[in-house]
């Protein structure tokens, strides 16, 4: 399958995850974006083959994974129309973070996985500044976010106040077990930034969950049109980012990225 088809279906799935959906009679989401993974895309499950065994053979370390197989659609949009209701529970699973899409003729396969945490992730500040470096790399060249083309944008600078706002929200989501731009106290990113002393003319936020490495989380945001647009917004000049772990430090990882343009 050509890469463009895989990218389009992943983009459509991430748009689906960005909004609250009705799934099996219940309101679900929004949930974080999925990161395209070439290893998962390269796995072909034959009859009687076990997904976990194939993942191990491909050297993909997963905390959990599932495969979806379906036939008939001739393009990505048709595929999305087929799966958004049939497989809504899997597509909206908040614990999965990586995705691989493959196709042979009109037979499609999607693998969704939760990767293990990167042993070299570092503390939240190290990881946050690594996110900044990866974001600036993305901003240094044109990007396509959904149907919108963005030109290269100036590099962002690290801001400790935005980083503190990001850490606060990541820790709150991880500790209280929710995923939303709105905190349990009702505050959103604008209030959190102000409470940490950041006076802004423009503010924005990306959140994600499940990605165990910096490269994975940034690739997930870039593969999701709304998150990608935040990354490429040329009017932002500063950024902070942080992750937090749920439970006793062994739970799901949650990421927050805050963008700002200070008042002058």
Regions found by a protein language model. Give the residues of each.
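Functional surface patches built around histidine and acidic residues
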Residues: 1-264
């Amino acid at each position: 399958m050509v890469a463009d088809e895989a990218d389009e279906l992943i983009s459509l799935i991430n748009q689906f995850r960005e909004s609250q959906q009705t799934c099996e009679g219940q309101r679900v989401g929004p949930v974080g974006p999925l990161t395209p993974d070439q290893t998962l895309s390269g796995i072909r499950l034959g009859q009687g083959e076990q997904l976990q065994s194939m993942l191990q053979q491909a050297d993909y370390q997963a905390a959990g994974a599932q495969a979806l197989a379906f036939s008939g659609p001739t393009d990505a949009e048709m595929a999305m129309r087929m799966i958004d209701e049939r497989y809504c529970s899997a597509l909206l699973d908040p614990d999965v973070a990586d995705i691989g899409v493959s196709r042979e003729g009109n037979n499609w396969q999607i693998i969704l996985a939760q990767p293990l945490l990167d042993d070299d992730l570092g503390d939240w500040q190290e990881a946050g500044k690594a996110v900044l470096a990866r974001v600036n790399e993305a901003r240094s060249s044109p990007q396509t976010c959904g149907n919108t083309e963005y030109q290269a944008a100036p590099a962002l600078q690290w801001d400790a106040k935005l980083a503190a706002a990001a850490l606060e929200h990541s820790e709150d989501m991880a500790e209280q077990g929710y995923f939303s731009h709105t905190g349990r106290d009702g505050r959103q990113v604008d209030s959190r930034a102000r409470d940490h002393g950041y006076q802004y003319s423009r503010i924005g936020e990306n959140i994600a969950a499940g990605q165990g490495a910096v490269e994975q989380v940034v690739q997930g945001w870039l593969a999701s049109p709304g998150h990608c647009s935040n990354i490429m917004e040329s009017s932002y000049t500063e950024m902070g980012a942080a992750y937090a772990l749920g439970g006793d430090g062994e739970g799901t990882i949650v990421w927050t990225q805050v963008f700002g343009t200070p008042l002058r």
